[in-house]
């Protein structure tokens, strides 16, 4: 759009401000400019030619407009000399403007539509080729070269940068370059002297604006980093809110968050000062430049070198052409970023290893697969690690037999499966299938003979049926159902609302761990493989489901060669042969009974997993923290309580809904004003600056019009005197402009930042006052709450504080301009005001043009990006099932919708853009033609009509700028709703209830009296019905039962994460509802199955249990948890930073730090939820001994899955369907042959 914005319209700061550049995640290599378009085909070349032609013509229309505009002004100035002849000339020029507008319409339409379409087409092709190249790589690539690569960033963010460069931004550059060239050519042809002088002053304004942009970018980066630090604090606290509540860490969290916000607030003062100074200095230079140009133009006019209109429009032409070059800079920057981004994409596509892709199809196939596998002298080391995994390893797996591999962590069990699938090649030796080296076999065919079930199932964000279908592409629905039945999945699938068409969510998040595993088993079963590869396939199932699925797997394994990787030895007792690996060598082979009788490594492993073998108590993992695959976890504590897998959305509680209904927009604004009350003085001072700044453009336009009309005076001395006067006034205005803008921006920025900090801190405190049930709601997940804290709080500031500055400024401008316009010529003012909708539309579409019409690319491609992310993160599953082609086709399908919509969107955007500019040109023509009519009728004069016309042009663009803020204001108002929804909510479980009992000591008597409970997110599913349970002070109570029986819920209720719906939960005879919650939690210590650590040092994480603990006490706690030794071995010892959520520590190390934290708390009641699950056998024994000591004299509740951990408990209760079905000691319960507990121990029987 050729929006002809007046050279002083109050929004230069909007043009000169630049967005903060993204952090440089990409390498500095870039493709050539032509290389950027290397994905183009013939259709794209035609589109680019047509689009380039359109944008070039479009760029030349504005300079031509000024030629006709100047001709009309000159005719109007001379109208009194020959009214009829000159009026005809005005009409002719007006018609030329209309024709030029039509050219603008067509050229803009073609330019926008063609560039958008070709950008979409080329980038879609790049995305597809990039994903295909990644999927064609072998696993070695992902272990070595790809470790530091961010493929998803390249396929999403980098591709968007390339699309932006190829599409919108290339068109922008061509348009502005053509405008620049045409403008200066016309300028030199019109008044070359004035063009040279204008060319000299424009760079000064550009330098000032550029310097301001650089300073603001630097400050913004620092401010953004400060807010990012605060966001990290909030995200970490909310993602681990149960740990924060359990250790009464709310106050510490708020203090940490507040300290992070203070850093950002300090930067806001510099930001406001820099903005005010930058904008003010730019306008000051603009005033002075116009003063100089007026003076020189008057000199040329007086000496007959040019006329007033030509001088005036030449200045405008050259200034706008110079600014066009400046407007091209962001687009050139975007193209530069696109070239760098394209280099990352083309590097992958261009370097696509032919061997990696060809070997999928090259090689021989066997007519009949028997299934005999031989390792002959195989030596191997991972490409990413120099240590040898195997050295001269040899063994034979006979066809149709089941071989299980066991051994300690790092012995190479999973490596065997990887090498059989040919993920890796041996350094020496051979791997044979039916006597044929697998190197010589067609890789895709080889993998089609195998079915893999991994320990951690990988599902894709599509339907259950599609996930099973991955095992066999052309299978029918009956085959899918049969496979699901074999995996014990059919019954739960059919119970879902959409059955097999149920969407599983990204990564299968809508399914439980056991459900995901059964889908993965069904996928392998569907393949009907000759060779079955099972890597702890039943690890995620509860005991009852495990038994059924194991039976199904036993049936599937018949007559198939099967390799089983075993952690839980109960899963391999019936296999044909067990191979024990240690240090990369086969130490023992034989059946289960043979190996037990030998008393070797296998027997040792069995004994480590069963300290009371004569009672057949359990079968457990002897290595629960595998470095390759991560620790086994059957569930996350409490986290699955958020929703059932596929429940319908629950209505919000009546209280929340009622509270939200009461919050109207007006009341929210009023409440925000009250929240911002401490800054009323800042608002007043900022508003004074905004009013003064707003009045300047109108007065500036009056000065322009006055000088222009003065140029047509017949008296040279009058021209000199009046123009000199205006020039001096402009210089004076330039001097006072900087202080005015500093006043406006400094105080408004300070007001906004202080408001943001106050809103964020209030929000954070309010969030941490809510009960856990509130966090369980989908809308209150960590991501949503973090967004409210960051994005919504920023939107409130942006919409209310930042935008208020512009609104006040433009309101001042509008009032001033309308008053002046109607004062000088109400007729002209009425006609031009009637054209305001057209002028406003032109301005708004011009702003859209600068941003680009492509819309939110990230959102448009979200589904495709999600699919790519899943495929790449689960590359082993994709490779194992030879699903590269399926994934690529599905990815292409996901890209097709945004690609098709680009055509329609391009035409709509281009036509709307061109039409608005055409109508703007017609509006100018109408206004000037009408002035000629009025002058001819003697109803106005040239001077007054031009003043009215010029001042209203400024007003139109200020109104457009204000209207452009409407979406931001609407977003801000909506954000207020999110903010006050949290601030107004009253928690169901107050942490500091008035009149509650403060406890300084508790004995530890705990009693459940007729407790009924259902999770708030699933009120229709009762967890407990009249539960009665008691543990005496100082005694231990173990809670066992099948999945979903309510074991973890017992701990949740004791911690008062939730309240019973009926009945009472008492501690020391007092209902815990009457006890001050924070004082109660100080006497309780929780150790969860998955330890939650904070991103700080080990020392600080342990000290979280007791802020007043001494160094000696911290060390003693670590020793008690068997953590001191590994901590001391670290380079920085206790000051070692654990990383985000403890990623720098292994699972076992994290658990021991968590146990040390609980030890330091010295609690009266200890709550252990599988506290030793993440430890290896040796560490588990030591930590269990430490916990046994810690439990002495304390009331202890143990939630147990691994029954070995509870054999010493004073009392064991078995829960089933929310009720206590058995109670007694371990010996008492195992003596009941038909009891629930006995059945559980039998299911976990290892020997």
Curated annotation (Swiss-Prot):
Keyword hit for Nucleotide-binding: yes
Transmembrane residue ranges: 49-69, 95-115, 172-192, 196-216, 277-297, 315-335, 680-700, 727-747, 807-824, 830-850, 915-935, 949-969
SUPFAM superfamilies recorded: ABC transporter transmembrane region (SSF90123), P-loop containing nucleoside triphosphate hydrolases (SSF52540)
PROSITE patterns per record: ABC_TM1F (PS50929), ABC_TRANSPORTER_1 (PS00211), ABC_TRANSPORTER_2 (PS50893)
UniProt-annotated binding residues for ATP 2: 1041-1048
Cited Pfam families: ABC_membrane, ABC_tran
Residue stretches making up the ABC transporter domain: 373-608, 1006-1242
Keywords linked to the UniProt accession: ATP-binding, Glycoprotein, Membrane, Nucleotide-binding, Repeat, Transmembrane, Transmembrane helix, Transport
Coiled-coil segments: none
SMART domains noted in UniProt: AAA (SM00382)
Residues where ATP 1 binds: 407-414
Keyword Transport appears in the UniProt entry: yes
Glycosylated residues in this chain: 362, 392, 780, 938, 1010, 1108
Sample GO molecular function, one term: ATP binding
Annotated GO CC locations: membrane
Cysteines engaged in disulfide bonds, as pairs: none
Mode of membrane association: Multi-pass membrane protein
ABC transmembrane type-1 domain mapped to chain residues: 48-337, 679-971
Subcellular location: Membrane
Family: Belongs to the ABC transporter superfamily. ABCB family. Multidrug resistance exporter (TC 3.A.1.201) subfamily.
Name of this chain's protein: ABC transporter B family member 14
Annotated organism of origin: Arabidopsis thaliana
Gene coding for it: ABCB14
């Amino acid at each position: 759009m050729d929006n002809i914005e007046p050279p002083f319209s109050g929004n230069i700061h909007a043009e000169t401000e630049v967005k903060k550049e993204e952090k440089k995640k990409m390498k500095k290599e870039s493709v050539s400019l032509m290389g950027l378009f290397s994905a183009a085909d013939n259709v794209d070349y035609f589109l680019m030619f047509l689009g380039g032609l359109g944008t070039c013509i479009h760029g030349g229309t504005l300079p031509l407009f000024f030629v006709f505009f100047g001709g009309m002004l000159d005719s109007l100035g001379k109208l009194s000399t020959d009214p009829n002849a000159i009026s005809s000339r005005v009409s002719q020029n007006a018609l030329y403007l209309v024709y030029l507008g039509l050219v603008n319409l067509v050229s803009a339409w073609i330019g926008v539509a063609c560039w958008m379409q070709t950008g979409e087409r080329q980038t879609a092709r790049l995305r597809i080729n990039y994903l295909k190249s990644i999927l064609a790589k072998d696993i070695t690539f992902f272990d070595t070269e790809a470790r530091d690569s961010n493929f998803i960033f390249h396929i999403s963010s980098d591709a968007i940068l390339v699309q932006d460069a190829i599409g919108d931004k290339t068109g922008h550059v061509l348009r502005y370059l053509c405008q620049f060239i045409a403008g200066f050519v016309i300028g030199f042809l019109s008044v070359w002297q004035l063009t040279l002088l204008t060319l000299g002053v424009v760079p000064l304004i550009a330098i000032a604006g550029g310097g301001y942009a650089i300073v603001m970018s630097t400050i913004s980066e620092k401010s953004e980093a400060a807010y990012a630090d605060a966001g990290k604090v909030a995200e970490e606290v909310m993602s681990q809110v149960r740990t924060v509540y359990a250790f009464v860490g709310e106050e510490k969290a708020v203090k940490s968050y507040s300290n992070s916000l203070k850093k950002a607030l300090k930067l806001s003062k510099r930001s406001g000062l820099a903005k005010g100074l930058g904008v003010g200095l730019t306008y000051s230079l603009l005033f002075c430049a116009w003063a100089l140009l007026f003076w020189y133009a008057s000199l040329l006019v007086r000496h007959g070198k040019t006329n007033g209109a030509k001088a005036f429009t030449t200045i405008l032409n050259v200034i706008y052409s110079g600014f066009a070059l400046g407007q091209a800079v962001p687009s050139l920057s975007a193209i530069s970023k696109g070239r760098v981004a394209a280099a990352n994409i083309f590097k992958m596509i261009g370097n696509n290893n032919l061997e990696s892709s060809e070997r999928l199809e090259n090689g021989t196939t066997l007519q009949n697969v028997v299934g005999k596998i031989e390792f002959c002298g195989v030596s191997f080391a991972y490409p990413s690690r120099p240590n040898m995994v195997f050295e001269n390893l040899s063994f034979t797996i006979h066809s149709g037999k089941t071989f299980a591999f066991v051994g300690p962590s790092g012995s190479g069990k999973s490596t065997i499966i990887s090498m059989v699938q040919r993920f890796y090649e041996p350094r020496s030796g051979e791997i044979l299938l039916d006597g044929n080296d697998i190197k010589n076999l067609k890789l895709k065919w080889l993998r089609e003979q195998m079915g893999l079930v991994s320990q951690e199932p990988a599902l894709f964000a599509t339907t259950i049926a599609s996930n099973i279908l991955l095992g066999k592409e052309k299978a029918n629905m009956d085959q899918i159902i049969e496979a699901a039945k074999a995996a014990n999945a059919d019954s739960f699938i059919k119970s879902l609302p959409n059955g097999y068409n149920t969407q599983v969510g990204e990564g299968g998040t809508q399914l439980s761990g056991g459900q995901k595993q059964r889908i993965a088993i069904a996928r392998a079963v569907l393949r009907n493989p000759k060779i079955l590869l099972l890597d702890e396939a039943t690890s995620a199932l509860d005991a009852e489901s495990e038994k059924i699925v194991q039976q199904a797997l036993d049936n599937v394994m018949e007559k198939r060669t099967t390799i089983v990787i075993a952690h839980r030895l109960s899963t391999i007792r019936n296999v044909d042969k067990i191979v024990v690996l240690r240090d990369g060598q086969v130490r023992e082979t034989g059946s289960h009974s043979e190996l037990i009788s030998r008393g070797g490594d296998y027997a040792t492993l069995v004994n480590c997993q069963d300290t009371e073998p004569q009672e057949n108590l359990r079968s457990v993992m002897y290595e629960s923290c595998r470095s390759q695959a991560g620790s086994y976890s059957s569930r996350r504590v409490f986290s699955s309580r958020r929703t059932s897998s596929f429940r319908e959305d629950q209505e919000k509680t009546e209280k929340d809904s009622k509270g939200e209904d009461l919050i109207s927009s007006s009341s929210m604004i009023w409440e925000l004003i009250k929240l911002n009350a401490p800054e009323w003085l800042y608002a007043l001072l900022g508003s004074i600056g905004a009013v003064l700044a707003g009045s300047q453009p109108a007065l500036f336009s009056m000065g322009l019009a006055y000088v222009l009309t003065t140029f047509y005076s017949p008296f040279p001395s009058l021209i000199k005197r009046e123009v000199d006067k205006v020039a001096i006034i402009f210089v004076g205005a330039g001097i006072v402009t900087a202080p005015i803008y500093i006043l406006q921006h400094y105080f408004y920025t300070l007001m906004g930042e202080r408001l943001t900090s106050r809103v964020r801190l209030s929000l954070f405190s309010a969030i941490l006052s809510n009960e856990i049930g509130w966090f369980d709601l989908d809308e209150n997940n960590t991501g949503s709450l973090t967004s409210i804290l960051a994005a919504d709080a920023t939107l409130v500031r942006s919409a209310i504080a930042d935008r208020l500055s512009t609104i006040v400024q433009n309101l001042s401008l509008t009032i001033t301009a309308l008053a002046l316009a109607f004062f000088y010529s109400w007729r002209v003012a009425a006609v031009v005001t009637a054209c305001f909708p057209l002028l406003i539309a032109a301005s708004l579409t011009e702003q859209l043009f600068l941003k680009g019409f492509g819309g939110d690319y990230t959102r448009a491609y979200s589904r495709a990006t999600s699919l790519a992310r899943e495929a790449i993160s689960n590359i082993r599953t994709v490779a194992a099932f030879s699903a590269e082609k399926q994934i690529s086709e599905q990815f292409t399908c996901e890209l097709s919708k945004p690609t098709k919509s680009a055509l329609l969107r391009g035409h709509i955007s281009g036509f709307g853009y061109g039409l608005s500019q055409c109508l703007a040109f017609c509006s100018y023509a109408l206004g000037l033609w009408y002035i000629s009519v009025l002058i001819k009728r003697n109803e106005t004069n040239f001077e007054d009509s031009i003043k009215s016309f010029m001042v209203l042009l400024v007003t139109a663009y200020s109104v457009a700028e204000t209207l452009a803020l409407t979406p931001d204001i609407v977003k801000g108002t909506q954000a207020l709703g999110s903010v006050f929804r949290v601030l107004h909510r009253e928690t169901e479980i107050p942490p500091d209830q008035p009149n509650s009992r403060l406890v300084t000591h508790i004995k530890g008597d705990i009693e459940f009296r007729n407790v009924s409970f259902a999770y708030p997110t699933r009120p229709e599913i009762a967890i407990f019905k009249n539960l009665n349970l008691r543990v005496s002070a100082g005694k231990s109570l173990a809670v066992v039962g099948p999945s979903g029986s309510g074991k973890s819920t017992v701990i949740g209720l004791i911690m008062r994460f939730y309240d019973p719906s009926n009945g009472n939960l008492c501690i020391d005879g007092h209902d815990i509802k009457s006890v001050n919650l924070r004082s109660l939690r100080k006497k309780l210590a929780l150790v969860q199955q998955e330890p939650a650590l904070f991103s700080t040092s080990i020392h600080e994480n342990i000290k979280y249990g007791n802020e007043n603990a001494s160094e000696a006490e911290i060390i003693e706690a670590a020793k008690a948890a068997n953590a001191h030794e590994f901590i001391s071995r670290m380079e920085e010892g206790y000051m070692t930073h654990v990383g985000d959520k403890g990623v720098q520590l292994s699972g076992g190390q994290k658990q021991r730090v968590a146990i040390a934290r609980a030890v330091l708390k010295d609690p009266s009641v200890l709550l252990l939820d599988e506290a030793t699950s993440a430890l290896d056998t040796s560490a588990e024994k030591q930590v269990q001994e430490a916990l046994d000591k810690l439990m002495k004299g304390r009331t202890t509740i143990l939630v147990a899955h691994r029954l070995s951990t509870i054999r010493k408990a004073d009392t064991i209760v078995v829960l089933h369907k929310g009720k206590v079905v058995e109670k007694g000691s371990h010996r008492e319960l195992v003596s009941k042959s038909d009891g629930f507990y006995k059945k559980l121990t039998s299911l976990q029987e290892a020997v």
